[in-house]
Amino acid sequence: MGTVLGAMRNVRWHELQHAYGSASQVPGVLSRIAWGDAPTSDEALSDLERWIGTPPVFDSTAATVPFLWELAATDTVRDRAGVLDLLATILAAGNAEHPAWTRAAHDAVAAGRATAARLAAAPEAPEVPGAPVAPGSPDAPGAQAVRTAAARLLAAIDRHQYLACPACPAPPPRET
């Protein structure tokens, strides 16, 4: 698997659940998002959104989020904007029956704030007529969509307050 998604093997996916059962197939879906052709990647992202991103969140959601951040930051991933949108969906989702899952998922999304800020601030490359556009360059197809999705997610992270979040339980009181 190389360095991208290499840490997936450290997660006990078979012990986690998503909306339709065991999360054991999540690593394969993440791999298809990372390396699949456009139709394969799109289908995998759609599957993952149904499994972990639609309300409610599951125990596998928080385990998946760090890998979504990794994909969002990897220039060769085809739909990085879609990955960022899935992270925003997770931040807005919850599970009233399992508030710890909600908090873990929201914390995992918030932990990637620096990545969202970097992606949102990526400079636009100056236009050079006739110059080829390299994958991952600021003018590559989808680069503006990534900047826009990252800016939306960054704003959502900054607005997200656990006390105001209906999906999040109140944090424990701090001892003084």
Stretch-by-stretch model annotation:
Residues V109-E124, G136-A164, P169-P172:
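Eukaryote-biased recognition of C-terminal alpha-helical segments
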Residues P39-E43, S60, T64, R78-R80, ...:
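Positions within the helices of HEAT/ARM-like alpha-solenoid repeats
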Residues M1-S24, E127-P138, C165-T176:
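Actinobacteria-biased recognition of intrinsically disordered, low-complexity terminal regions
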Residues R9-R12, R32, R50, R78-R80, ...:
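Arginine residue identity/basic-tract feature
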